Amino acid sequence: MMSSYSTRRTFFAFIATLAFSLAPATAQDARRGYVPPARDTVRAVAADHGMMVAQERFSAQVGADILRRGGNAVDAAVATGFAMAVTYPRAGNIGGGGFMVIHSADRNEDITIDYRETAPAATTPQIFLGADGKPDATKSRDSALGVGVPGTVAGLALALDKYGSGQFTLAQLLAPAIALARDGFIVSDDIADTLPSWHRRLARWPSSAKIFSRPDGTPLVEGDRLVQGDLAETLSAVAALGPRGFYEGEVAEKLAKAVTDAGGIMTPADLKAYRPVIRAPVRGTYRGYDIVSMPLPSSGGVVLLETLNILEGFQLADLKQGSPASLHLLIEAMKRAYADRARYLGDPAFVNAPIETLIAKDYAAKLRAGISAERATPSKELVSASAAPREGSNTTHFSVVDGRGNAVSNTYTLNFSYGVGLVADGTGVLLNNELDDFTAAVGASNAYGLVGFEANLPGPGKRPLSSMSPTIVLKDGKPVLVTGSPGGSRIISTVLQVIVNVLDYKMDVAAAVATPRLHHQWLPDEVRVERGFPDDVLLALKAMGHLIVEPMGQTSANSILVTPSGLLGAADPRTRGAEAAGQ
């Protein structure tokens, strides 16, 4: 156990440096909008012994420090996951949930941990309908009815218990997060830019306003210090008692009271009953590589594999990356897989989805046969039904690889930025509005335009369908690429394009991440595109019948490529403050 006085002293000096000395590095006038850099100007960060890539620099350094001190990829992931609850409050969390994919080199095993939020026991299929029987989006998005039972604390603790190195206790891995919450850190330009848009939402509750506001009631600005004393106490309770410090006792009582006082239905019994689930990953192959991703209740792995299977029948390498012909095939493959997502997928505890059929090569061949090389297929010709719920894009993803070949791909979320906006008084915990990912009614869409069917209706104890797609690509049983992204429904298409860019087009991982992306999710029948595609390419896609819409929306595919000569980390340049930290 690494617990000597000198190790602790060095460690807390490191945290103090993070909290007090790291100033935002991005210029204010370069903040707004993503303009893809020239491909020859982006560079991956190289390392020999370990790599952490995360959407926020303080937390990336926390994970890298754990690797430096002999921890494995899971140890580092747990430390970073808790730290991001402090330093990246719009998505990092202990009041939400997510998914983790682990490759254990020591055990030659691939596993996943589902720590998705669950619906409280009092949830009914009609909970998000108005008096007229139609979906009322304000109930799931803007009220405490949308709060699901958080899973992050239980999920991260389970990962450490089952797959950590054994060199660190949970309390040791929580120490960086506790220090950052207690002592505070300098507000970054990213936090300062997002707060004005969400401050009115946060300010509905005094418990939230007092944390994210200046004394005059205006949002914190870049250079202010964000101190979260109550959150430090909550994290300390978890350090002392493990998950019981969150799911039982004083913290649980405060969480439940905050929700019920705000009109929600989560109770202390719901919190005590929460359990994360270890699941076998969904697996497939693409161009001779093994793709390991998240199974249901995340749709990510299934839709990703279905899309890759469709594309495998086309020789994409013979088409120029970013050409109209290659992009058309990507769009058409996405369209078909997302249509199946809406029709079939939901919580596996409640829905018997035809997964083996959906990820079968022969099924992909049938779908591929319906793709014209010259003409866009109207979405209405694929399935005669309505679309799936819109998911929150304010998720966050980090990737980790250690020197022994262990790898972690982790995506977690509050759904919207800052979740529902409610900090449970006395806990510092920002609560999610994740239940908006359920289908409020058959055919209704959620906040991100995804349409759903009966499989994803709300129900007690049920986990809402997700698009989170933490993924590890293997060759001969060893990690080659670790990737994932935030972005709601755009997560799957983002991960898809990173994989295709690396495996088909042999792009450097930094360029594969930075290059412009597009997205189609079946309904609405439109192609969302980032800036950076040449006008002639967009005109050619329009001529094929594609409706082109800008912008695509935020994604951040923080990725690691494992090469014979070492590790290459690519922090997505779309996110200010993202960092690849190697050692």
Question: What residues fall within each predicted segment?
Answer:
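Extended C-terminal subregions enriched in glycine
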Residues: 441, 462, 504-552
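Short beta-strand scaffold segments in enzyme catalytic cores
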Residues: 92-93, 97-104, 396-400, 470-472, ...
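Noncatalytic scaffold domains of N-terminal-nucleophile
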Residues: 28-61, 73-241, 246-248, 253-299, ...
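Bacterial N-terminal signal peptides
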Residues: 12-23
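Active-site rim segments in enzyme catalytic domains, especially the processed small/beta chain
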Residues: 86-112, 265-267, 406-475, 505, ...
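Bacterial N-terminal signal peptides that target proteins for export
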Residues: 1-14
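Alpha-helical support elements that line or immediately flank enzyme active sites
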Residues: 66-67, 154-162, 241-248, 253, ...
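Internal maturation/activation junctions in enzymes
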Residues: 207, 213, 313-414, 423-427, ...
